[in-house]
Amino acid sequence: MRLSFPRLSSLKLMAAGAAISISAIVIAAPAPDPTSAVGLWEQVDEKSGQPESWFKITEKNGVYQGNIVKIYFKPGEDENWVCDKCEGDERGKPVLGLALIKGMKRNGTAYEEGTIMDPRDGAVYRALMKLSPDGQKLEVRGYLGISLFGRSQTWNRLPDSALAPTPPPTRGPAPKGPPQKK
């Protein structure tokens, strides 16, 4: 006895293959870890309560870094700010896009052994980060020597969708130095 199967057109076969592939990708894609600092964060001025900048924290091979992805400039400040007091490869580069947080290693909800740079003066500080239990706040602490001698900020998590892809701005060469009032 010979079994016969209906013949499927090549278009139907391709559609079926694509559907299977897409469902496999969706099933295999890891769910975001709500206890991870990876994501988009808003830095808020402690005095005014106004947002100052956004950082995108990423992880590669167990090491976390934070790049500045948005800066809220005050009226009259130079929007083409470059880090002229930074050391090494960062010197003279636009602050927007720089990795200001580097070398963080995760230890539960804490991130340790990293550094944070102040782009206004190029100073590099040791740093710690601690994620809140609900994953919506990130305490970022920069310090000299021991953690006791430092300063902390609390950043607020933003949805990753808040950072819509936009084409890079087309501007002339960026002037050097921190933002200056005009």
Located regions from the model:
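C-terminal segment of classical bacterial N-terminal signal peptides
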Residues: 20-28
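N-terminal helix-cap/turn-to-beta initiation motif at the start of protein domains
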Residues: 27-39
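Compositionally biased, proline/threonine/alanine/serine-rich low-complexity intrinsically disordered stretches
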Residues: 29-32, 163-182
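Surface-exposed interaction patches
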Residues: 109-154
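Bacterial N-terminal signal peptides that target proteins for export
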Residues: 2-18
